[in-house]
């Protein structure tokens, strides 16, 4: 199968936004507003009852989606419904294994996604990484890997040699927490290990100064999720939310 490439997104610094597929607050106008105002890649989360590395905001988003009747099939119907420059799918390997990893890849391909990210893969299931890489090739995806600064340097270098679309570096242990002052140093070290592989940073970014800090340290882009979900689910007026999203 021909390879789907996200390389076009990385001709400049990248903004990737996380949204939960099927969260009642993730309406079409939210996605359209974000798309019109500079979001390069949309990362759609597949709701699961056990989002073990997410903070309270995204866990609540998953819960809303599940309680509203969202299923695996409905999640991908939601994703398929939007024509966007770039979109990827995020879910946990633990969940993907329970439904069938190949089934997940097939759904992602049919929904027009350009990759599948499994944040717990290298943390909890590193022995299955070769299966993930093989299925990515089978379905025409470049692999995407999630790492943290606590990963062994040798492993990070090995992951970069697998030619991923990008590497997503989690800055904190869970989403939505505060950034420590050592972040810039960690980003610089990781970037030196992966050479030309694009590096996106996320898990705790909510303010413009944090974005600048990551970019200055060498990141090729940032991922914002919890801050946006808090905004759209906070009960504000639609026009005010639109202005904030811009």
Task: Give the positions of each predicted feature.
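Hydrophobic faces of well-ordered beta-strands that scaffold small-molecule active sites
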Residues: 13-19, 42-44, 87-91, 116-118, ...
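Glycine-rich phosphate-binding active-site loops on the catalytic face of alpha/beta enzymes
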Residues: 40-51, 111-125, 167-177, 204, ...
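Acidic (Asp/Glu)-rich catalytic clusters
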Residues: 10, 35-36, 79-84, 105-110, ...
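Active-site-adjacent beta->alpha loops and helix N-cap segments on the catalytic face
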Residues: 2-9, 24, 48-60, 66-79, ...
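Conserved, mostly hydrophobic/aromatic
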Residues: 17, 34, 42-45, 108, ...
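Catalytic cores of alpha/beta
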Residues: 26-36, 102-103, 150-162, 201, ...
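Hydrophobic alpha-helical segments and helix pairs
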Residues: 82-126
């Amino acid at each position: 199968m021909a390879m789907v490439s996200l390389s076009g997104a990385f001709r400049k610094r990248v903004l990737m936004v996380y949204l939960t597929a099927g969260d009642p607050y993730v309406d079409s106008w939210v996605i359209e507003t974000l798309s019109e105002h500079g979001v390069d890649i949309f990362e759609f989360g597949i709701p699961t009852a056990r989002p073990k590395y997410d903070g309270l905001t995204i866990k609540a988003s998953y819960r809303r989606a599940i309680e509203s009747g969202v299923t695996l099939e409905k999640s991908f119907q939601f994703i398929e419904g939007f024509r966007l420059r770039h979109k990827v799918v995020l879910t946990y390997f633990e969940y993907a294994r329970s439904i069938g990893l190949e089934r997940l890849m097939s759904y992602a391909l049919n929904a027009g996604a350009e990759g599948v990210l499994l944040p717990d893969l290298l943390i909890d299931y590193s022995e299955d990484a070769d299966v993930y890489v093989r299925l990515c090739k089978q379905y025409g995806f470049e692999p995407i890997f999630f790492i943290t600064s606590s990963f062994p340097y040798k492993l990070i270098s090995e992951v970069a040699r697998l030619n991923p679309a990008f590497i997503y570096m989690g800055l904190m242990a869970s989403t939505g927490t505060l950034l420590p002052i050592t972040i810039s140093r960690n980003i610089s070290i990781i970037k030196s290990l992966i050479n030309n592989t694009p590096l996106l940073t996320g898990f705790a970014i909510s303010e413009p100064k944090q974005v600048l800090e990551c970019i200055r340290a060498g990141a090729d882009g940032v991922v914002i999720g919890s801050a946006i979900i808090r905004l759209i689910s906070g009960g504000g007026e639609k026009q005010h939310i639109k202005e904030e999203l811009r």
